[in-house]
């Protein structure tokens, strides 16, 4: 994901372009700018609270596999040897019953895996991908992504400053927009590499097979034609597979 730092500048540019056309609520614009600035300094508790709301909204919008479903039973078995606290948060794992190939994790430990991904991965590959998502939480990448998503939502306050009602709380629609912004953000290549290494190290520490990381990335690379949504936030899978193979070879 690419960490966007230009939200405030973009908002102020919009304000400048529209100021000559209509009467603006300056106080509202100041509030919008303040919200964008504050977004990048949200406390851990605030990010977790936003993630809690966003995760609940995502769960409400998707068909979640039941406790007794084959998908949930398999997922819980796969993650059992990986489970640990992530930045003080207890991870919770659920499956979305959709054929989309995707997985993501939020700063509150909300980790969601799509059935389409599970169908294409064996257990070792699935652990590698999930370990990667856990890495984004532990290393603070998911926190930064939520801060960025929230900061970009400040653009709505610019519209409010032109005369629309001011949004004081996130309703279902706004939570949906926040969740979409979070999922559509992109981590940097360095963040992706760090999460790959986190997964490799976690698997090694737990004495689990690491070769699945390589084959998982190879499968994702083969899906680069558009079938895999996970590819939009996980670029360069072929190169990453090669790097993981180099780590495996070096450890022999």
Model regions and ranges:
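A Zn2+-metalloprotease active-site environment signal
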Residues: 2-4, 21-252
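Sec-dependent N-terminal signal peptides
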Residues: 4-14
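C-terminal motif of bacterial Sec signal peptides marking the signal peptidase cleavage site
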Residues: 16-20
């Amino acid at each position: 994901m690419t960490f966007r730092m230009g939200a405030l500048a973009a908002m102020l540019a919009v304000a400048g372009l529209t100021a000559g056309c209509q009467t603006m609520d300056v106080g509202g614009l100041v509030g919008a700018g303040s919200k964008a600035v504050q977004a990048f300094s949200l406390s851990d508790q605030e990010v977790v609270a936003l993630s809690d709301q966003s995760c609940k909204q995502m769960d409400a919008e998707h068909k979640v596999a039941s406790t007794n479903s084959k998908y949930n039973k398999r997922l819980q078995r796969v993650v059992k040897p990986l489970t640990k606290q992530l930045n003080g948060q207890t991870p919770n794992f659920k499956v979305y019953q959709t054929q989309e190939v995707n997985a993501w994790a939020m700063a509150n430990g909300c980790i969601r895996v799509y059935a389409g991904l599970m169908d294409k991965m064996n257990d070792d590959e699935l652990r590698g991908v999930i370990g990667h998502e856990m890495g984004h939480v532990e290393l603070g990448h998911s926190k930064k992504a939520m801060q960025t998503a929230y900061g970009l939502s400040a653009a709505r306050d610019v519209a409010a400053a032109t005369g629309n009602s001011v949004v004081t709380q996130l309703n279902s629609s706004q939570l949906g927009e926040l969740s979409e912004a979070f999922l559509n953000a992109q981590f940097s290549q360095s963040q992706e590499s760090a999460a790959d290494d986190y997964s490799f190290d976690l698997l090694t520490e737990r004495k689990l097979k690491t070769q699945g990381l390589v084959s998982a990335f190879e499968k994702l690379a083969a899906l680069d034609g558009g079938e895999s949504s996970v590819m939009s936030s996980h670029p360069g899978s072929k190169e990453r597979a090669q790097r993981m193979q180099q780590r495996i070879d070096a450890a022999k």
